[in-house]
A protein has these predicted regions:
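Hydrophobic beta-strand-centered segment that forms part of the acyl-chain substrate-binding groove
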Residues: 98-134
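Hot-dog-fold acyl-thioester-processing enzymes
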Residues: 24-25, 46, 71-97
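Catalytic strand-loop segment that frames the active site of acyl-thioester-processing enzymes
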Residues: 50-83
Length: 169
């Protein structure tokens, strides 16, 4: 166990020399370890506990993009047996937040301001959650594109989350 911890520490140190973003450092260090992305996703969900209700697992993270999966299970189903749209919105807020933290310039900070979503088809399978950010980071309102897809690739929810971006004090 001690060797595994030392190995992980060395990997993190190597990434910190090339990148300054904590979320990306953790992602790159943990993606190579079996179950590592599940651990990372759960750690992030502990920061904002309501994310634990949908148990998202990050599958891909890079500057400007976060993807995660969300299992269709009884805890997130509605009365007709599909994934409840509010659970999907919760998952979309998760990927948006992770994507923003992995992408935002160090002199800026953000807060979510609003969400607009359209329900475009039934969510009758596990869900893939995606958030995409453009590279234009300016003070003021900014929209992050979000989409949720079924396993067959069919979109079930499309929309955007508006952020309020300000300079750090």
């Amino acid at each position: 166990m001690k060797n595994s911890i030392n190995y992980l520490n060395d990997k993190i140190k190597n990434y910190t020399q090339t990148q300054s973003n904590t979320v990306l450092i953790a992602y790159h260090a943990l993606k190579k370890i079996p179950g590592g992305l599940t651990v990372l996703s759960r750690v992030i969900s502990r920061v904002a506990p309501y994310f634990r209700t949908v148990d998202p697992v990050i599958t891909k993270l890079e500057v400007g993009l976060c993807q995660a999966s969300m299992a269709k299970c009884r805890a997130v189903e509605n009365h007709i047996g599909t994934v409840h749209v509010i659970a999907i919105c919760n998952g979309l807020e998760f990927v948006m937040g992770v994507a923003v933290e992995a992408s935002i310039p160090s002199h800026l900070r953000w807060l979510p301001k609003g969400m607009h979503v359209d329900y475009v088809s039934k969510a009758n399978s596990d869900i893939q959650l995606i958030a995409k950010i453009n590279d234009d980071w300016n003070v003021g309102d900014m929209q992050v594109e979000v989409i949720a897809k079924r396993n067959d690739g069919q979109p079930v929810v499309k929309g955007y989350i508006t952020l309020w971006v300000t300079e750090k004090k």
